[in-house]
Amino acid sequence: MPALNNSEAGTAEAEPLTRLPFEPITKSHILNCSYDNWHAKYRSSTLKSRIIPLTSEFLSYLREDGIVLPSEIATFPPPETYNNNSTSDGWDEDTDTGPDPSEKFSEIHKQIQETIAELDGSVVPKLNWSAPKDATWISLKQNSMECNTPNDIYLLLKSSDFITHDLEHAFDGCAEDPSITKESTQYVLVLRKWFKVNPSCEFRCFVRDRRIIGICQRDLNYFEFLFPLIPTLREVIQEYFDKTLKDTFPDRNFSFDVYLPDPFDKVRLVDINPWAPRTDPLLFSWLELLTLSVPSPLLGVADSSSVPPLPAQSSDEDEGTDDVEELGWMPEFRLIKKDDPEAYSFSSPQYSAHKMPQEVVEAGASGEGGMREFADNWQRMLNGELEMMGAGEDSDDDDDDDKTTR
């Protein structure tokens, strides 16, 4: 076979990428990253949590349009009257409560109540892969995922696009595998004990070929005090990875999130994420992470990157050592710098695209009457009377001039 001349070879190498060079993403990899599939193995370093397997009835409730909450004593007082000139309190006291949706999943409802009590009354919910971070706008806990009752949890889960993705699109973009389907997946509700998190202490780590190749902040704001701590943080995270995750997680490529509270000497494993475009690379790009040149290990399986090999070690002490690593190479540790554009552009609220349902936008655009009608319907929805969607015609407001067609 004739060899390519230099010009032909150069042309071949210069072909631009038309897509990110991911290996085929398998459904088994997605399942390996499901919380219930790794939590037991790494429980000693995770945050205190409980896992509740979900039934088809509960999943149907999450998938239903609209928001109907079970009857339950509210954990917050009703807001002040929306109309200061009104002689009534603005809330419907003569209600005809509809069927309680929790009757279809009474065992799950009871387990949630018991778990909240076990975890000191405050929890943070998530499903197999995602937490409803995009739905905190609807929470009455000031943009927090803290939940004190089952209804707090249901409201977040049913309002979240991230949760919908877990339920409907978990295996999008994966290679075909008839043995793994959405219907055969065991969905779970994870309830973590709530505590006040310092967002500056959360980090995302990217693993390729069982090696950390990059670490960065999860919260994209500038924290000056972190820069002198980079060597310590990198060492503590690397040591945790080498002892806990490196040889035990079933996939060689993945990312994981950790929390290192002050004094930054102990790692808490928060999550394990797929090595896939759906995972946010944050301060990196996926093209960087996929093509970054990394030295091949002296022993064991070589890294897939095409880089010159390191010279062989001549010391007799190196022979037979299984944990030999390259000297002088460390994973890159990225933080937001004071003058970075990200230090300012990311100071805006996260997940803003998910924060305002169309009904609220339309009610606000309709003026005072529209917002009054929406407030009535919202309170009735919290009382379990009606669905949030399509509730306008049931408003008890007698002033026809104030009604708005939507």
Curated annotation (Swiss-Prot):
Keywords: ATP-binding, Chaperone, Cytoplasm, Magnesium, Metal-binding, Nucleotide-binding. It is found in: Cytoplasm. ATP binds at residues 126, 129, 131, 133, 192-195, 202, 204, 218, 257, 271, 273. ATP-dependent protein-folding chaperone for the eIF2 complex. Binds to the gamma subunit of the eIF2 complex which allows the subunit to assemble with the alpha and beta subunits. Pfam families: D123. Residues 78-102, 303-323, 387-406 are annotated as: Disordered. GO terms for cellular component: cytoplasm. Residues 393-406 have a biased composition (Acidic residues). One of its GO terms (molecular function) is magnesium ion binding. It comes from Botryotinia fuckeliana (strain B05.10) (Noble rot fungus). Belongs to the CDC123 family. It comes from the Eukaryota. One of its GO terms (biological process) is eukaryotic translation initiation factor 2 complex assembly. Its main location: cytoplasm. This is Translation initiation factor eIF2 assembly protein. Mg(2+) binds at residues 271, 273.
